Design a protein with these regions (language model features):
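Membrane-proximal alpha-helical anchors
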Residues: 1-73, 81-82
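An amphipathic alpha-helical interaction surface
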Residues: 39-41, 55-159
Length: 159
């Protein structure tokens, strides 16, 4: 009887360790960063440096007194005056349910090979209120993380 109880506990521990290994092998690791700041190929880029895909749940931007339930590109075009007039500006939207594969990079805002539009965008950003963003995403196993502009690393959300 003691051997049976020991064997059952051992099997349960093995299943738990296997499950934890599966979760880690599919974990997304999302970051948002500037690329080539101030240069002619400037971009604000979302990276998935994890081993598994990330599924976007929500994106919000907060200023001193307002929270906007919108992605970065929409915020730039709808809230920051003058952004829509910048030539050579490209953007990608982040939508709930969007899948970001492991190893993928998405330029949320980018300017290709043009210094003058880069300078114009950076001036508009510097003259705008400071923002913080919150990106909530999940793994294929429905583990959820939050990434904010104040943190360097995503934080796992408890259920």
């Amino acid at each position: 009887l003691i051997a049976l109880i020991y064997q059952t506990n051992l099997m349960r521990l093995e299943q738990q360790l296997t499950r934890e290994a599966e979760l880690k092998s599919k974990m997304p690791y999302v970051m948002i960063a500037n690329k080539n700041y101030g240069g002619p190929n400037y971009a604000i880029t979302l990276f998935n440096k994890g081993l598994g895909p990330a599924i976007i749940d929500s994106f919000s931007i907060t200023t001193e007194d307002t929270t906007y339930q919108m992605d970065l590109a929409t915020y730039f075009f709808e809230v920051i005056p003058g952004v829509a007039e910048i030539n050579s500006l490209f953007y990608s939207n982040l939508l709930p349910g969007q899948l970001v594969p492991a190893g993928e990079e998405i330029d949320l805002i980018s300017i290709d090979n043009s210094q003058e539009p880069t300078n114009a965008l950076l001036r508009l950003m510097e003259n705008s209120p400071d923002i913080d963003y919150q990106l909530i995403y999940r793994s294929v196993y429905d583990e959820r993380w939050v990434l904010t502009g104040e943190a360097f690393f995503p934080v796992k959300l408890e259920d």
